[in-house]
Amino acid sequence: MPMAHQDFNSLCYTSSLMEIIRLSEEYVKALANENGNMVDGPYAGRFTAYDLKKTMAVLLESMLERLHRLENFLNVVTNGTMLNNTQNISSKDKQASFILAKDLIMGIKEECILTEEDIKMYPNCRSKMYWMSKMWKSDNCYASYGVDGSDCSFIMYLSEVEGFCPKKAWSGSKQLNLNSLMQLLIDPNERQGYAWIRMRITRMWSRWSAAATRLSKHDYMANRSKKKILVHLGLLSKQSGWKFAENQFKGGPLGELVQWSDLISTLYLLGHDLTITISYLLILSHLPAAKSPCQSRKELPVHIIYTDIVGLTQFKKRVKGGYGKFSCLFRILDSFGTEPAFNHRNFAKQNKILTSWGGQDLLPRQFFTMFPHSPDNSFMGFVVEQHLNNSDVRSTDRKQQAVVYGKNDYMWKVSLFLYRFHKGKEKYLDVIKDFVEIHGTVAGDKHENVPKYVINHGILNGADLHKLLSESKIFIGLGFPFEGPAPLEAIANGAIYINPKFIPPINNKNSPFFKGKPTQRQLTSQHPYAEEFIGEPHVYTVSLDNLTEVKETVQKILNKNEFKPYLPYEYTEEGMLQRMNAYIQHQDFCQFDAKISKWPPLEAITTVLGPAGKSCRDTCLEKNMICEPNHFLELNNQEAIEKQSLKCSNMIKSSNIYYPAYNIKTKQCITQADNLLLSCVGNNEQLQRLCPCRSYIKGQIALCIGCEW
């Protein structure tokens, strides 16, 4: 009898399999017939059968996945008698809270478990889930919150929105399936706006997924809240007028696209619910509740919105009266940062420093930068791509050669105007060429500003560029471009970076590049991060005016003959995942009370009275700490100032970027009257700043010691 039962089940399986294959064949034939008379090719237009082969490949892959899932199911039905019994779908992983997207495709259910303790604490949860299972289609609002008929979506909604179920019954999971992410990156206008981003994500995916797996082993990655996140890339929209999409493969600026690529990878791998758009017209469709200014913020279908300044402007125009209630949800990608003085619209107007980029009146921490140059903003960063591992880099034979940092001819020309010596870069490079062969990677055919002795390779792909860097001993900075990713790539490949020093510092008054940018930063070198946080022996910051110093530096590098790869943890995939996870879990810009900030914790903060004329940024750095603007509020009073062994002649309140502070001439104690102007970077010759300084993890500046989660 058991054998007959087995034969019957095998017969059913074969019959079901043949039926699926037959139906699949009919579907493919119908699709082919429907599109058979259409024009094919990449320029055939929008409503054509372009690349039917790719479509078929996707369909076939989907069929195979479905067949495999059916085999797993039938294997259970037939008591495991099938030969290809490759997995036990009833087995439970110890880390059940982390479900892979591919597992969901294979039919393994997401772990959303109600324990007995949960049921006791939330007695209405089960009955509400039952109601949801019957009624979730009764109103479209449930689907807008992500309810899709699954138990997990019910629990997520009932915990996050209505509070009837425990949040711990589900946790943010990591997703490792690349195909699912690629489905989010399809340009509805067929402009291939995401093309470069898709290529970078795909190329780096194995490293990203490995980093996510390593990080998931830490306790602080469990029980994370899952967020609904809208990502709008304003710079890629047609309305931006910047033509980023059109120029992404023509030598155009890629720094912003690097950051967007890595942010999208990070958010996806951390398991959040993503909506991605580059269409200005689609904004309202993703924010239906934003039309009215009086609706509750809780009714919005998103928790966080990532965009750029262009996108922020588009949001303001599109949603008009509804903007105010969700402005606190914004996180703005802002490469060079926005300082409080420029962000505060009225203050900027009064002081005649208002720019087209500034005056947003957001909290300064809502601006996310590429490098940690201003503690008032949040450091998002990016990932330095690595084509070779450290052992490969160390084993590569280095040649007596150097590579110049400058992929466009105009970059070599710009460097002429950064220094006072008349013969410019040629005199500087002439010194170096006496010791090493000089190579370049300059695009195009016209190289008017490139010295004849430079061996130019043109624009190289990533693998070839990293190979060239790993074979070279020195990476030569010309002074421009400012703060790019290339020096970090060179250092990661073991090359020593010569970082041009600026005397006097570059700023928005003496450099056309910074004119109009909402910052008064003083760039002391081409790459301040490399100068301040990496330094020797990987980075030598020298004045290109001083040719003797240049010569001695090159000799020192070659004599030491040590070329070890180095990459700060914060610029690795794992480092970015850790940092962004901490931000997402702890940063809340929609709390408007004056309570002491819980994150970073108060235990990580040291109050320091700076010398007159020095900013809190510099005061904290000298103590090997970072200025922490979240903790200015508890220092903004007379008691906190007098704790520094000072006696106030009188107390006054004022609105400027220098306070809280002590005036060394008048003995006055001055507190901040406008919290939006609390600033790490303000300084005044007569004032001693009272500074909240925090510890930081070397190689992970955004996080304090002990607050990695």
Task: Please name every model-derived segment.
Residues 247-256, 368-470:
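Conserved catalytic-core segment of nucleotide-activated headgroup transferases in glycan assembly
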Residues 294-423:
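Catalytic core of nucleotide-activated saccharide and alditol-phosphate transferases
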Residues 608-678:
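Folded, disulfide-stabilized extracellular/luminal domains of secretory-pathway proteins
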Residues 676-709:
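Short, structured beta-strand segments at or near domain termini in extracellular proteins/domains
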Residues 473-579:
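Catalytic binding pocket for nucleotide-activated donors in carbohydrate/polymer assembly enzymes
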Residues 595-614:
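Extracellular disulfide-stabilized recognition modules
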Residues 7-20, 24-27, 32, 36, ...:
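N-terminal pre-catalytic "stem/leader" segment of glycosyltransferase-like enzymes
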